[in-house]
């Protein structure tokens, strides 16, 4: 394609187009106003001519003059005085034979009226306005019949204004109108220039082709980002998003379904409206979007020190959280194995002591007793708990409790036979582990001799229900509202106050609830309820 030597800029093109548009618009408007004004003026002049003619036809002296020997001597002075007073071009009065009794040119009195538009007045007795070419030229005239006292038509009055004079008036008015139009056109062109410069500044001096290229580049970058991105205007309506964001919101939504919608229609609990109001960014905040947990960053967008929108980026929290939970579970397993190893070592030492003392029977009794206890626990979990991971965690925690000198009792009617979803299993292991760790810490810090923990669980009904109770000092009433806050702890030391906060987050993610009560053992009693079908947001 051949390039122009001097290519026109977008501003120049726009200015030229708008200028042509303004000129064409005002030219058409001028022509329309010209026609409208000419038509209106002609109608006004016609009505004026008709009203003068009607007034003349009703003058008694004029009507009586038709029966005089020389009507023109009476009628001509009357008609002329009225013509001069009203500014009419002519007032012609004639009889039924169209012989003139009055005319602005006296030499034409006695001659026949011309124009061919008198029949309606003389024959039908009508009053009307007509256009015709008379002896003085083209004119607009009002025609009125003259009646005698008996209602008989005895003549006609014709009052007119020459078209030439009307066109002159129209021309004078049009000159003034076109002067105004020209001034408005000049102002319009100046406005066009201002608009063109404003657009140029708003587009940072970029041409449409450059804007298009940058838009495509931005779109490619936006879609290649692994993080979800959603931008809104100051009203909170979506102006930009990428496909990664739609994976969180709804992969089936089209672009047309998203753009222009309020962000809260797509993400229920988003805090972007808050960012728009406050004007401060929010970083690394957790938010549930659909069935996914995300880590969100939100920042306002400023233009000329004014908030014009906001943008949110978010990434999947599940991978990070899953890794964290796996590490937590590994720690629980490690603690359980360490406890079992330590407990097994203690039992071996006990057996060794019996054997060294020669008390074979006591050693055998001890082994059988321990074997029975282990078999009872294993048999219980095989019969009453369907999920091996949950069973393993509970067994490990029981061993850890025994090592710490804590007696663990599980309600014999407890059961967990309903299969767990993968996410439910992962979070349930975290919740059980943290609740039991919390109970261990509370009992060890209390100094109580007979430390006890009571556990019960059931899957009867629509929910999974878990209860963990201890005989420790419990939670003071004034701290019950704060116990689940991240970083809050009743125990001294750093890196505390996260266990119960994690439990609460996990419970809420599964659509459940956690309650803190005073247990029958006198200590704290935590009750979890989790829907069997994992809740989805919205």
From Swiss-Prot:
EC code: 2.7.13.3
Domain Histidine kinase: 339-534
Membrane-side (Extracellular) residue stretches: 35-174
Cytoplasmic side of membrane: 1-13, 196-538
Pfam family of the protein (one): SPOB_a
Gene Ontology CC annotation, any one: plasma membrane
Catalytic activity: ATP + protein L-histidine = ADP + protein N-phospho-L-histidine
Keywords assigned: ATP-binding, Cell membrane, Kinase, Membrane, Nucleotide-binding, Phosphoprotein, Transferase, Transmembrane, Transmembrane helix, Two-component regulatory system
GO biological process, one term: regulation of DNA-templated transcription
Membrane-spanning parts: 14-34, 175-195
Membrane topology per record: Multi-pass membrane protein
Modified residues annotated as Phosphohistidine in this record: 342
Gene3D superfamilies reported in the protein's UniProt record: 1.10.287.130, Histidine kinase-like ATPase, C-terminal domain, PAS domain
InterPro entries, A to Z: HATPase_C_sf (IPR036890), His_kinase_dom (IPR005467), PAS (IPR000014), PAS-like_dom_sf (IPR035965), PAS_fold (IPR013767), sCache_3 (IPR033463), Sensor-like_sf (IPR029151), Sig_transdc_His_kin-like_C (IPR004358)
Domain annotation PAS: ranges: 216-282
Localisation: Cell membrane
The protein's role, per its UniProt record: Member of the two-component regulatory system CitT/CitS. Functions probably as a membrane-associated protein kinase that phosphorylates CitT in response to environmental citrate or Mg(2+)-citrate complex.
Protein name: Sensor protein CitS
Source organism of the structure: Halalkalibacterium halodurans (strain ATCC BAA-125 / DSM 18197 / FERM 7344 / JCM 9153 / C-125) (Bacillus halodurans)
Gene that encodes the chain: citS
């Amino acid at each position: 394609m051949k390039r122009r030597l001097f290519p026109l800029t977008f501003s120049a093109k726009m200015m030229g187009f708008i200028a042509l548009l303004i000129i064409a618009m005002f030219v058409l408007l001028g022509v329309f106003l010209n026609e409208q004004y000419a038509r209106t003026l002609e109608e006004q002049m016609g009505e004026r001519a008709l009203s003068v003619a009607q007034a003349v036809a009703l003058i008694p002296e004029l009507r009586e003059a038709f029966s005089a020997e020389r009507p023109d001597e009476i009628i001509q002075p009357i008609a002329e005085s009225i013509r001069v007073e009203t500014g009419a071009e002519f007032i012609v009065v004639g009889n039924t034979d169209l012989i003139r009794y009055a005319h602005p040119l006296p030499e034409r009195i006695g001659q026949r009226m011309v124009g061919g538009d008198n029949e309606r007045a003389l024959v039908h007795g009508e009053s009307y306005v007509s256009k015709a070419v008379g002896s003085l030229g083209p004119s607009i005239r009002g025609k009125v019949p003259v009646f005698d006292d008996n209602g008989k038509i005895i003549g006609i009055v014709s009052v007119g204004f020459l078209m030439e004079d009307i066109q002159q008036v129209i021309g004078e008015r049009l000159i003034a109108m076109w002067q105004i139009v020209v001034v408005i056109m000049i102002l319009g062109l100046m406005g066009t220039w201002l608009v063109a410069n404003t657009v140029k500044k708003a587009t940072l001096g970029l041409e449409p082709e450059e804007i298009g290229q940058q838009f495509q580049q931005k779109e490619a970058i936006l879609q290649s980002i692994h993080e979800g991105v959603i931008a809104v205007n100051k009203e909170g309506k979506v102006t930009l998003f990428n496909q990664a964001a739609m994976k969180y919101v709804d992969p089936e939504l089209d672009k047309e379904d998203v753009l222009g919608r309020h962000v809260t229609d797509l993400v229920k609990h988003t805090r972007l409206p808050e960012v728009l109001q406050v004007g401060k960014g929010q970083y690394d905040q957790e938010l549930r979007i659909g069935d996914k947990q995300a880590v969100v960053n939100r920042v306002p967008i400023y233009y000329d020190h004014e908030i014009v929108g906001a943008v949110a980026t978010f990434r999947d929290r599940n991978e990070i959280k899953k890794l964290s939970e796996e590490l937590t579970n590994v720690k629980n397993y490690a603690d359980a194995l360490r406890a079992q190893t330590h407990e097994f070592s203690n039992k071996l030492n006990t057996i060794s002591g019996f054997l060294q003392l020669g008390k074979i029977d006591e050693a055998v009794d001890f082994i059988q007793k321990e074997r029975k206890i282990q078999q009872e626990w294993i048999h219980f979990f095989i019969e009453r708990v369907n999920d091996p991971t949950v069973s393993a965690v509970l067994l490990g925690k029981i061993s850890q409790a025994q090592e710490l000198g804590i007696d663990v009792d599980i309600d014999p009617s407890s059961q967990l036979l309903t299969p767990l979803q993968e996410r439910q299993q992962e979070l349930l292991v975290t919740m059980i582990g943290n609740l039991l760790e919390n109970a261990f810490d509370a009992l060890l810090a209390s100094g109580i001799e007979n430390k006890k923990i009571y556990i019960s669980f059931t899957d009867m009904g629509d929910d999974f229900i878990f209860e963990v109770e201890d005989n420790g000092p419990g939670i003071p009433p004034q701290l019950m509202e704060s116990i689940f806050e991240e970083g809050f702890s009743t125990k001294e030391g750093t890196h505390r106050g996260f266990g119960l906060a994690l439990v609460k987050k996990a419970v809420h993610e599964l659509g459940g609830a956690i309650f803190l009560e005073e247990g029958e053992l006198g200590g704290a009693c935590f009750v979890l309820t989790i829907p069997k079908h994992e809740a989805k947001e919205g």
